Amino acid sequence: MNKLILLPREFFARDTNLVSTELIGKVLYFQGKTAIITETESYIGQDDPACHAARGRTKRTDIMFGPAGFSYVYLIYGMYYCLNFVTETEGFPAATLIRGVHVISPENLYLNGPGKLCKYLGINISHNKCDLINNNEFFVSDIGLKLPYSTTTRIGITKGTDKLWRYVVTDIIRLPA
């Protein structure tokens, strides 16, 4: 693998759709496991009806209001965890949902779906509000991998389904084994 370039807070503190697209091909490191990010979705502010912060700031959504570069982990359907990275400027609630990864260590495995990737990696509610910048066990890096991706509508939601804010790698063959 190429030299690690850890993503700085400034990477996350930008437009959420830009962050979501630029996270494609970045490498997620979590407690000794390594995975290439292959699918993301954007959730942006109180005007986005699918965003958890659409109804305002609550104890649950407080992390989404910044600062950027922290994890936002929550439980869905009472059984699956979802991993998000907080984006944008402090005070504006936004995050990128990590929907899919290609695990490259300790094994070669494609995981589509946020619940599957959290289960495999061992991410749970105790990993909510983790600083991704100052962390040796949980961070994101850039190894210079550029992957083709397509843009689609978000899935698994009932509101805001018209937004083209889902980004999916189109050529899994190009991923390193």
Swiss-Prot record:
User: Any idea which UniProt keywords this protein has?
Assistant: DNA damage, DNA repair, Hydrolase
- What molecular functions are annotated in GO for this chain? alkylbase DNA N-glycosylase activity; DNA binding
Q: Which InterPro entries match?
A: Formyl_transferase-like_C_sf, MPG, MPG_sf
Q: Which GO terms describe its biological process?
A: base-excision repair
- Does the UniProt entry include the keyword Transcription? no
The record, for SUPFAM superfamilies, names: FMT C-terminal domain-like
Q: What is its EC number?
A: 3.2.2.-
What protein family does this chain belong to? Belongs to the DNA glycosylase MPG family.
Q: What is this protein called?
A: Putative 3-methyladenine DNA glycosylase
Give the species this sequence originates from. Answer: Rickettsia felis (strain ATCC VR-1525 / URRWXCal2) (Rickettsia azadi)
Q: What is the lineage of its organism?
A: Bacteria, Pseudomonadati, Pseudomonadota, Alphaproteobacteria, Rickettsiales
